[in-house]
């Protein structure tokens, strides 16, 4: 966090700083730590030795730029070179070469990675910290049972428990347990050492009978007993080296390796002084843990809170990349050993270059970024989404929890989260509480803990000093929850009582007992929550919805900044990287839509701008220049605004005139009524870019061809293709049009030709085409303008590297019925009707309202912040002011929010000479008129300017209909989902509903013709064309036949019979 000469000043830290620091730590420390673990490799005769000189490794600067890597679908990575030596011990010769061992993906300026042209981000994982934890549970008799859990660095767990007779057991599996004496002996201690290193030797001697003495008489006996219990082996196993190795691999390596964090935690919890370099569990640790467990039983010591953040650690991008690098080096070691053995066997010449392959490192990182749950595709819906995605904290992933097994206690807010993890911003649904977001000022410390900044309070001086505290330290201090404004730095009276936090409790205590105070009103919140004005007036559930929905806002074609916003809007837009920023001061000598040329310090710098780039959510990323030619600029000044930014500030939506009133039922249950002005004036118009791609392969019959000459297709469908067979730039394409013409060769026998084909060949000698048409066609709902075509040819040109053609089509989408809109307070709704301007309710000055919300959506949801924002937005619009709202302003003055809003409305009423803006009888409300009749409504209505967002959930992406399509092979029923042109499921309850209305024929159609009756649905088409009567299906549908076959597979025969009405003869029919 930057500091300047004024000690009392601070700035908001870079929001991507955590990602940058993690990657730098991996490059500076992690690489070398893993390199030092790489052993010297010898052959079986110990005549040849291979080793890496890791101190001289080199990371080469990437050959391509970030933008080119995205364009050409490549990985933005750095090549890693290491000097390697091959030593012949007999001749004492050494050959040294610098070898290439693989590519390491590099982090770019946004804190993300580019892998195969796709932006990916590695999110932080929060895990239980390795160490020892004590807890108490009640058994079935209601008696407290004390246990200690030792968690290893790998996540393995070992438990020590004490029974009613004060005997201590180590649980080695879910059902098996062994004596603590056997475990200590198996780890290498004898009885004398055990009794010398414990505080209660008499308790250990009390459960030492003759059988126990025999078990711990020697290390071999203890290991055999341990192995017998651990592996659940009967009989009398024999001690051997392989038995020790199996026990080492399956138990000790997974459950006893603490790591440096675990060793530190173990030393602090058990008051030990074992060196930090000793990261393995020792007999001394186990005996000290047993002593503490005995103390717990007799009421000494404190239990651990497993959900406290001091008992958690953050697994950052550095740890994940370092783990993968270590895995790659292990694979490299195995490959080198195999290559040396093979080369000696076949008497080949050995060099360091041909011993090492780069595939181990490259494929390890490719599989990590492609398959690991914590490596995710960067969500680029809008700038806020990009910056928030990298600050997520997840309990899920390898070594973590799952959404179905996590308890409520883990998901809940904990007092230690204060200033570190946002109490509001989390996902909805099954992962609620398991995926959180870092608070604005939080940072990750050296030991993997989350640290938060505070100011130290000096009673007799006015100077302030900022300190970062980990969760284990701040519970020893009294922390005032107010910031500098609330605590009145000019001089606080000694008798003043202030709210404070001490040892996970929230208290009100005297000012002279305060040790620390907060530095910022938004310190406790994440970026998403801190963008909500008047958040203190909202229910927490609605604030959660709002922080999630702001990330779903679509960048609009013309953005507008909010009239009432929070203080973090500029910092979020700046750190997202969507705006172009001057890297040095100078003068603008040229500007257009593609680039800005800057002259400064004798150099000319060309800054390329993003032009209609597609994000992975199909939104449009675009930059608009904000500087004119000849203008002098300073370093850090905004040169071009990106998507959803205005003047370098976040602008996700639009300020529109809203009214809270019912209107003919069209805003029932969160529906929203809007004016046609929002459509015709492109208020909520957005651009979306879709990508369509096709690949050409080399088949067994020959290579596929891209061509514009496609037989059997109408010329109308091929009208946009150029002579290469690819759609021309700037073409307007509709559903079904050909984007890329492609022919796939196929073999055709003489017998497979149709009769007319054979006749043409015999009479006219015309060669019938043997190629199949496999063109790229525009699917349903894809109409638009072609803005880019990319033909990507991979190097090598083999059949394993197919050519790829990508077509990008831009769509202009106005707001329409079915689209989803939302405010910043969790007030979301679906557009139900677009009303003409003259029919909308209008104000006393004749201005028609833009949106009508349901007033019943406010009291029950308790998101009253939207009312304050609505009224303050109206005042700001009339006074041409923008407001920055600090949260929890009631701490400065009672009813501070209401006083601010009413005073601004009163001033706006005076300056504009419009008394209806602020009427004392019903402040904030106004009499408005029905646009259809011109009569005033009975009650005054709340009107104002709200900041409303258009969300990514749009009706064009959701609406779907099916006449006929594909069927599942087994059940013969229509497929599921819009992408597969699927059908609508008619389940059991839907059938009941139709039966209740007595619509027998419709129900029969749904269950037969429209579903899985094969013969009946084939006959429907023919009878419909000729105008005949649709025949009634006679036999059973395919799903019933499937059921019969399933029963037959279980040796249950099921048949049905037809009984004649005339002579009651039974005709047996096979199902």
Curated annotation (Swiss-Prot):
Chief localisation class: plastid
UniProt keyword annotations, A-Z: Chloroplast, DNA-directed RNA polymerase, Nucleotidyltransferase, Plastid, Transcription, Transferase
UniProt enzyme class: transferase
Subunit annotation: In plastids the minimal PEP RNA polymerase catalytic core is composed of four subunits: alpha, beta, beta', and beta''. When a (nuclear-encoded) sigma factor is associated with the core the holoenzyme is formed, which can initiate transcription.
GO biological process: DNA-templated transcription
HAMAP family, alphabetized: RNApol_bact_RpoB
Subcellular location: Plastid, Chloroplast
PROSITE patterns xref list: RNA_POL_BETA (PS01166)
Entry-linked Gene3D superfamilies: 2.40.50.100, 2.40.50.150, 3.90.1100.10, DNA-directed RNA polymerase, beta subunit, external 1 domain (2.30.150.10), DNA-directed RNA polymerase, subunit 2, domain 6 (2.40.270.10), RNA polymerase alpha subunit dimerisation domain (3.90.1800.10), RNA polymerase Rpb2, domain 2 (3.90.1110.10)
Catalytic function, reaction form: RNA(n) + a ribonucleoside 5'-triphosphate = RNA(n+1) + diphosphate
Its EC number(s): 2.7.7.6
Cited function: DNA-dependent RNA polymerase catalyzes the transcription of DNA into RNA using the four ribonucleoside triphosphates as substrates.
Statement: the UniProt record of this protein carries the keyword Metal-binding: no
One function term, GO molecular function aspect: DNA binding
NCBIfam families xrefs: PRK00405.1
InterPro entries, A to Z: DNA-dir_RNA_pol_bsu_ext_1_sf, DNA-dir_RNA_pol_su2, DNA-dir_RNAP_su2_dom, DNA-dir_RNAP_su2_hyb_sf, RNA_pol_bsu_bac, RNA_pol_bsu_CS, RNA_pol_Rpb2_2, RNA_pol_Rpb2_2_sf
Name this polypeptide is given: DNA-directed RNA polymerase subunit beta
Organism domain of life: Eukaryota
Gene Ontology CC annotations of this record: chloroplast; DNA-directed RNA polymerase complex; mitochondrion
Family listed: Belongs to the RNA polymerase beta chain family.
């Amino acid at each position: 966090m930057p500091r300047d000469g004024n000690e009392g000043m601070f700035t908001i830290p870079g929001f991507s700083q955590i990602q940058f620091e993690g990657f730098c730590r991996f490059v500076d420390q992690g690489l070398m730590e893993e390199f030092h673990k790489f052993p010297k490799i010898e052959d079986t005769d110990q005549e040849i030795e291979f080793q890496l000189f890791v101190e001289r490794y080199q990371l080469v600067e990437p050959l391509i730029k970030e933008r080119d890597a995205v364009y050409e679908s490549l990985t933005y990575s750095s090549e890693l070179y290491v000097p390697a030596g091959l030593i012949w011990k007999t001749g004492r010769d050494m050959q040294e070469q610098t070898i290439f061992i693989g590519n390491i993906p590099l982090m770019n300026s946004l804190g993300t990675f580019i892998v195969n042209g796709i932006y990916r981000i590695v999110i932080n994982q929060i895990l239980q910290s390795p160490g020892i934890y004590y807890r108490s549970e009640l058994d079935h008799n209601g008696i407290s049972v004390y246990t200690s859990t030792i968690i290893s660095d790998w996540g393995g767990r070992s438990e020590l428990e004490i029974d009613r007779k004060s005997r201590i057991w180590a649980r080695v599996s879910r059902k098996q347990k062994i004596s603590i004496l056997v475990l200590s002996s198996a780890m290498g201690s004898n009885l004398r050492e055990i009794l010398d290193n414990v505080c209660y030797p008499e308790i250990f001697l009390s459960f030492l009978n003759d059988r126990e003495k025999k078990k711990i008489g020697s290390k071999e006996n203890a290991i055999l007993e341990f192995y017998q219990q651990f592996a659940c082996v009967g009989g009398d196993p024999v001690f051997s080296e392989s038995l020790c190795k199996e026990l080492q691999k399956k138990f000790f390596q997974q459950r006893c390796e603490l790591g440096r964090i675990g060793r530190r935690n173990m030393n602090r919890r058990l008051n030990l002084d074992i060196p930090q370099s000793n990261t393995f569990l020792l007999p001394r640790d186990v005996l000290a843990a047993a002593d503490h467990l005995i103390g717990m039983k007799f009421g000494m010591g404190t239990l651990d809170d497993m959900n406290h953040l001091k008992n958690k650690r953050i697994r950052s991008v550095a740890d994940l990349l370092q783990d993968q690098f270590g895995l790659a080096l292990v694979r490299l070691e195995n490959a080198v050993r195999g290559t040396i053995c093979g080369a000696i066997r076949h008497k080949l010449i050995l060099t360091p270059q041909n011993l090492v392959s780069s595939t181990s490192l490259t494929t390890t990182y490719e599989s990590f970024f492609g398959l690991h749950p914590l490596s995710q595709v960067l969500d680029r819906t809008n700038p806020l989404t990009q910056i928030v995605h990298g600050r997520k904290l997840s309990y899920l992933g390898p070594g973590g929890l799952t959404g179905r097994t996590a308890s409520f206690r883990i998901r809940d807010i904990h007092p230690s989260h204060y200033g570190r993890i946002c109490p509001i911003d989390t996902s909805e649904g099954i992962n609620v509480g398991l995926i959180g977001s870092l608070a604005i000022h939080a940072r990750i410390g050296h030991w993997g803990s989350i640290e938060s900044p505070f100011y130290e309070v000096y009673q007799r001086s006015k100077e302030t000093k900022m300190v970062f505290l980990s969760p284990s330290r701040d519970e020893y201090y009294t922390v005032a929850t107010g910031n500098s404004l609330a605590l009145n730095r000019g001089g606080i009276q000694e008798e003043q009582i202030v709210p404070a936090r001490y040892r996970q409790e929230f208290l009100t205590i005297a000012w002279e007992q305060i040790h620390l105070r907060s530095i910022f009103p938004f310190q406790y919140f994440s970026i998403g929550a801190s963008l909500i004005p008047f958040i203190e007036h909202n229910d927490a559930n609605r604030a959660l919805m709002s922080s999630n929905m702001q990330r779903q806002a679509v960048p609009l074609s013309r953005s507008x900044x909010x009239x009432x916003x929070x203080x973090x809007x500029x910092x979020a837009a700046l750190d997202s990287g969507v705006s172009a920023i001057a890297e040095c001061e100078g003068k603008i000598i040229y500007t257009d839509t593609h680039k800005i040329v800057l002259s400064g310090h004798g150099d000319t710098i060309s800054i390329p701008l993003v032009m209609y780039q597609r994000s992975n959510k199909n939104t449009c990323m675009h930059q608009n220049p904000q500087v004119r030619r000849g203008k002098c600029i300073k370093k850090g000044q905004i040169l071009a605004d990106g998507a959803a930014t205005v003047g370098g500030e976040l602008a996700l939506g639009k300020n529109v005139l809203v009214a809270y009133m019912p209107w003919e039922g069209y805003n029932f249950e969160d529906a929203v009524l809007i004016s046609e002005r929002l459509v015709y004036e492109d208020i909520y118009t957005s651009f979306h870019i879709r990508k369509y791609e096709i690949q050409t392969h080399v088949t067994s019959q020959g290579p596929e061809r891209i061509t514009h000459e496609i037989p059997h297709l109408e010329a109308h469908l091929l009208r946009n293709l150029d002579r290469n067979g690819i759609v021309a730039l700037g073409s307007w394409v509709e559903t079904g049009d050909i984007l890329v013409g492609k022919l796939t060769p196929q073999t055709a026998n003489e017998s497979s030709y149709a009769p007319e084909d054979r006749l043409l060949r015999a009479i006219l000698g015309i060669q019938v085409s043997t190629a199949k048409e496999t063109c790229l066609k525009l699917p349903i709902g894809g109409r638009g303008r072609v803005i880019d075509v990319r033909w990507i040819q991979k190097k090598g040109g083999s059949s394993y590297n197919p050519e790829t053609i990508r077509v990008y089509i831009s769509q202009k989408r106005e707001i329409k019925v079915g689209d989803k809109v939302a405010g910043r307070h969790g007030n979301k709704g679906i557009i139900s009707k677009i009303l003409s301007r003259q029919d909308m309710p209008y104000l006393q000055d004749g201005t028609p309202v833009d949106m009508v919300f349901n007033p019943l959506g406010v009291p029950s949801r308790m998101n009253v912040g939207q009312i304050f924002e609505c009224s303050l937005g109206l005042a700001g619009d009339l006074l041409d002011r923008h407001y920055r709202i600090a949260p929890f302003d009631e701490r400065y003055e009672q009813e501070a929010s209401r006083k601010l809003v009413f005073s601004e409305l009163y001033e706006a009423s005076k300056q504009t000479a419009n008394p209806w803006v602020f009427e004392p009888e019903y402040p904030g409300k106004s009499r408005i008129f029905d646009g259809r009749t011109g009569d005033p409504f009975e009650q005054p209505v709340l009107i104002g300017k709200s900041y409303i967002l258009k969300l990514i959930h749009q009706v064009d992406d959701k609406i779907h209909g099916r006449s006929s399509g594909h069927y599942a092979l087994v059940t013969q029923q229509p497929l599921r989902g819009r992408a597969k042109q699927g059908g609508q499921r008619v389940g059991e309850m839907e059938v009941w509903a139709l039966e209740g209305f007595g619509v027998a024929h419709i129900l029969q159609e749904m269950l037969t013709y429209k579903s899985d009756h094969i013969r009946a649905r084939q006959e429907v088409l023919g009878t419909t064309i000729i105008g005949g009567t649709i025949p009634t299906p006679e036999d059973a549908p395919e799903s019933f036949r499937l059921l019969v076959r399933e029963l037959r597979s279980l040796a249950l025969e099921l048949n049905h019979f037809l009984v004649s009405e005339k002579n009651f003869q039974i005709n047996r029919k096979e199902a």
